[in-house]
C-alpha cells in the first residue's frame, strides 16, 4: 500500500524486522507500507541498476553506502522496465542530484513507482544485525498515523518467506522478443528469461549474437524452435528449489548437447539439473566487490553478486552426473560458496555472479567469450 509522497522526507517512518528489532527514521520515496525480505547490498555505486534488477523482487534492500542518490536517475541505466525492490533503506539520501545525465531525483522515481523507503536510520547497525541474525522478513511503515509496534510486527510475521518462493514467472517477459546482433550476425541464442537484466543480452549482441529472449514458461520445443547455436539461462528471484520447470528444460538442452551458459539463478538451475542440491545462505552475497577465484586459471576476479541461495556441490572432487563429469569452476574467497560449475564432457557452464557488470567490474566479461568459443567449437 502506498499513498502520496508530497513532503515525504518530513514524514515519520519505522522499519520493523521479524525478530522484533525496530529502527525509526523518515520516509523516502512513497509513503505507506511495504513488506519483503531484508537484505543488504555493499555496492558504493550502481543503485539504479540494483533497483531495476528483477532478482531483487520481493526484497527490501539496505544500502551500506552512506550517501545514495547523488547522481539521480536517468533513462539509460535501467536494467528492466521498472523498479523491482519491495522497499529501499538508505542512511543519507541526496535530495538534489548532480549529474549531466540525470532527469529526476531518486526520491522522485521511487515515489512515482510507489516504492516505500526509509532514510535517516543507522544502516551500519542494521547491516550488522542482518549479518549476525541472517536475512529476514521486514516491513517499512510510514505516515503520520502509524500503527502500534505490536500490530506492525504481527503484519511482518504474516508475510511469506523467501524460502519456497517461486517468483521467476512474476518478473519474466510474457512474450518472446529478439535482441538483434550488433554488426554481423554470427550466432543465435535462445535465452530463457527467469528475470533477465537488460545488459546481459546486450553483452551477447556485442559479440554478434542474435538473442531470442523467451518466457520463463518456455518449453524445450520453444527453445529449439529458434534453431539456437546456444542456450542461455538468466538470473532471477526466488528459491531455486521451486524451479522444477526450468530444471526440466535445462535437462532437455543438456541431453541434446547444445552449448549452454547460465548466470546466477541459471547457475542454480544447472546445479539442480546435474543432481546437486541448493540451500539458502545466511545473508547472501549482494554488491559489486566480491572476490571470486577461477579454479581453472587461479585468477581472482572482483565480481558483482546478487544471490541469497547457492549450489551444494563438492569443492574437492569431480562429480559424476547424468550428463558426464562436472566440477566446481569458481568459488567465493570470502566463504567458499560455489560460484561456478562446468561440465567436462559437454559444452555447458555457469556462474553464480554477474559478468555483464551492470553495475560492477568487468573482470568476468571473458565468460561471454567462452560461450562464443563453445558455439564455435560445436560448429567446427
From Swiss-Prot:
<feature type="binding site">
    <location>
        <position position="238"/>
    </location>
    <ligand>
        <name>L-glutamine</name>
    </ligand>
</feature>
<dbReference type="Pfam" id="PF00117">
    <property type="entry name" value="GATase"/>
</dbReference>
<feature type="active site">
    <location>
        <position position="354"/>
    </location>
</feature>
<keyword id="KW-0055">Arginine biosynthesis</keyword>
<dbReference type="GO" id="GO:0006207">
    <property type="term" value="P:'de novo' pyrimidine nucleobase biosynthetic process"/>
</dbReference>
<dbReference type="InterPro" id="IPR050472">
    <property type="entry name" value="Anth_synth/Amidotransfase"/>
</dbReference>
<keyword id="KW-0665">Pyrimidine biosynthesis</keyword>
<dbReference type="InterPro" id="IPR036480">
    <property type="entry name" value="CarbP_synth_ssu_N_sf"/>
</dbReference>
<keyword id="KW-0028">Amino-acid biosynthesis</keyword>
<comment type="pathway">
    <text>Amino-acid biosynthesis; L-arginine biosynthesis; carbamoyl phosphate from bicarbonate: step 1/1.</text>
</comment>
<keyword id="KW-0547">Nucleotide-binding</keyword>
<feature type="domain" description="Glutamine amidotransferase type-1">
    <location>
        <begin position="188"/>
        <end position="380"/>
    </location>
</feature>
<dbReference type="InterPro" id="IPR002474">
    <property type="entry name" value="CarbamoylP_synth_ssu_N"/>
</dbReference>
<feature type="active site">
    <location>
        <position position="356"/>
    </location>
</feature>
<feature type="region of interest" description="CPSase">
    <location>
        <begin position="1"/>
        <end position="184"/>
    </location>
</feature>
<dbReference type="InterPro" id="IPR035686">
    <property type="entry name" value="CPSase_GATase1"/>
</dbReference>
<feature type="binding site">
    <location>
        <position position="236"/>
    </location>
    <ligand>
        <name>L-glutamine</name>
    </ligand>
</feature>
<feature type="binding site">
    <location>
        <position position="265"/>
    </location>
    <ligand>
        <name>L-glutamine</name>
    </ligand>
</feature>
<keyword id="KW-0067">ATP-binding</keyword>
<dbReference type="GO" id="GO:0006526">
    <property type="term" value="P:L-arginine biosynthetic process"/>
</dbReference>
<comment type="function">
    <text>Small subunit of the glutamine-dependent carbamoyl phosphate synthetase (CPSase). CPSase catalyzes the formation of carbamoyl phosphate from the ammonia moiety of glutamine, carbonate, and phosphate donated by ATP, constituting the first step of 2 biosynthetic pathways, one leading to arginine and/or urea and the other to pyrimidine nucleotides. The small subunit (glutamine amidotransferase) binds and cleaves glutamine to supply the large subunit with the substrate ammonia.</text>
</comment>
<keyword id="KW-0436">Ligase</keyword>
<dbReference type="InterPro" id="IPR017926">
    <property type="entry name" value="GATASE"/>
</dbReference>
<feature type="binding site">
    <location>
        <position position="268"/>
    </location>
    <ligand>
        <name>L-glutamine</name>
    </ligand>
</feature>
<keyword id="KW-0315">Glutamine amidotransferase</keyword>
<protein>
    <recommendedName>
        <fullName>Carbamoyl phosphate synthase small chain</fullName>
        <ecNumber>6.3.5.5</ecNumber>
    </recommendedName>
</protein>
<dbReference type="GO" id="GO:0005524">
    <property type="term" value="F:ATP binding"/>
</dbReference>
<feature type="active site" description="Nucleophile">
    <location>
        <position position="264"/>
    </location>
</feature>
<comment type="subunit">
    <text>Composed of two chains; the small (or glutamine) chain promotes the hydrolysis of glutamine to ammonia, which is used by the large (or ammonia) chain to synthesize carbamoyl phosphate. Tetramer of heterodimers (alpha,beta)4.</text>
</comment>
<feature type="binding site">
    <location>
        <position position="55"/>
    </location>
    <ligand>
        <name>L-glutamine</name>
    </ligand>
</feature>
<dbReference type="GO" id="GO:0004359">
    <property type="term" value="F:glutaminase activity"/>
</dbReference>
<dbReference type="Pfam" id="PF00988">
    <property type="entry name" value="CPSase_sm_chain"/>
</dbReference>
<dbReference type="GO" id="GO:0005737">
    <property type="term" value="C:cytoplasm"/>
</dbReference>
<dbReference type="GO" id="GO:0005951">
    <property type="term" value="C:carbamoyl-phosphate synthase complex"/>
</dbReference>
<dbReference type="InterPro" id="IPR029062">
    <property type="entry name" value="Class_I_gatase-like"/>
</dbReference>
<comment type="similarity">
    <text>Belongs to the CarA family.</text>
</comment>
<feature type="binding site">
    <location>
        <position position="308"/>
    </location>
    <ligand>
        <name>L-glutamine</name>
    </ligand>
</feature>
<dbReference type="GO" id="GO:0006541">
    <property type="term" value="P:glutamine metabolic process"/>
</dbReference>
<dbReference type="InterPro" id="IPR006274">
    <property type="entry name" value="CarbamoylP_synth_ssu"/>
</dbReference>
<feature type="binding site">
    <location>
        <position position="309"/>
    </location>
    <ligand>
        <name>L-glutamine</name>
    </ligand>
</feature>
<feature type="binding site">
    <location>
        <position position="306"/>
    </location>
    <ligand>
        <name>L-glutamine</name>
    </ligand>
</feature>
<dbReference type="GO" id="GO:0004088">
    <property type="term" value="F:carbamoyl-phosphate synthase (glutamine-hydrolyzing) activity"/>
</dbReference>
Amino acid at each position: 500500500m502506498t499513498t502520496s509522497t508530497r513532503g515525504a522526507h518530513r514524514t515519520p517512518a519505522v522499519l520493523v524486522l521479524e525478530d522484533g528489532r525496530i529502527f525509526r527514521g523518515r520516509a523516502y520515496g512513497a509513503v505507506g507500507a511495504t513488506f519483503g525480505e531484508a537484505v543488504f547490498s555493499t555496492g558504493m555505486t550502481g543503485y539504479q541498476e540494483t533497483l531495476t534488477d528483477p532478482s531483487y523482487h520481493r526484497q527490501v534492500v539496505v544500502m551500506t553506502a552512506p550517501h545514495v542518490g547523488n547522481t539521480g536517475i536517468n533513462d539509460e541505466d535501467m536494467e528492466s522496465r521498472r523498479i523491482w525492490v519491495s522497499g529501499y533503506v538508505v542512511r543519507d539520501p541526496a535530495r538534489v542530484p548532480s549529474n549531466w545525465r540525470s532527469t529526476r531525483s531518486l526520491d522522485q522515481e521511487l515515489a512515482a513507482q510507489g516504492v516505500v523507503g526509509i532514510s535517516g536510520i543507522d544502516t551500519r547497525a542494521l547491516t550488522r544485525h542482518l549479518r549476525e541474525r541472517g536475512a529476514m522478513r521486514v516491513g517499512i511503515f510510514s505516515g503520520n498515523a502509524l500503527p502500534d509496534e505490536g500490530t506492525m510486527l504481527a503484519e511482518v510475521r504474516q508475510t511469506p518467506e523467501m524460502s519456497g518462493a517461486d517468483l521467476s514467472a512474476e518478473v519474466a517477459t510474457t512474450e518472446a522478443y529478439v535482441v538483434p546482433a550488433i554488426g554481423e550476425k554470427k550466432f543465435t541464442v535462445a535465452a530463457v528469461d527467469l528475470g533477465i537484466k537488460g545488459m546481459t543480452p546486450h553483452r551477447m549482441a556485442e559479440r554478434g549474437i542474435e538473442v531470442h529472449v523467451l518466457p520463463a514458461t518456455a518449453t524445450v520445443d520453444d527453445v529449439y524452435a529458434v534453431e539456437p547455436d546456444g542456450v542461455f539461462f538468466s538470473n532471477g528471484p526466488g528459491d531455486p528449489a521451486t524451479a522444477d520447470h526450468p530444471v526440466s528444460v535445462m535437462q532437455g538442452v543438456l541431453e541434446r548437447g547444445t552449448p549452454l551458459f547460465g548466470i546466477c539463478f541459471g547457475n542454480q538451475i544447472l546445479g539442480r539439473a546435474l543432481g546437486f542440491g541448493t540451500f539458502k545462505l545466511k545473508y547472501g552475497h549482494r554488491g559489486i566487490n566480491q572476490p571470486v577465484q577461477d579454479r581453472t586459471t587461479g585468477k581472482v576476479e572482483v565480481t558483482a553478486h546478487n544471490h541469497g541461495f547457492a549450489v551444494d556441490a563438492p569443492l574437492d572432487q569431480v562429480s559424476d552426473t547424468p550428463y558426464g563429469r562436472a566440477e566446481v569452476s569458481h568459488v567465493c574467497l570470502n566463504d567458499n560458496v560455489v560460484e561456478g560449475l562446468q561440465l567436462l564432457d559437454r559444452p555447458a557452464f555457469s556462474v553464480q555472479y554477474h559478468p555483464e557488470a551492470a553495475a560492477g567490474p568487468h573482470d568476468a566479461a571473458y565468460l561471454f567469450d567462452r560461450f562464443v568459443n563453445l558455439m564455435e567449437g560445436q560448429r567446427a
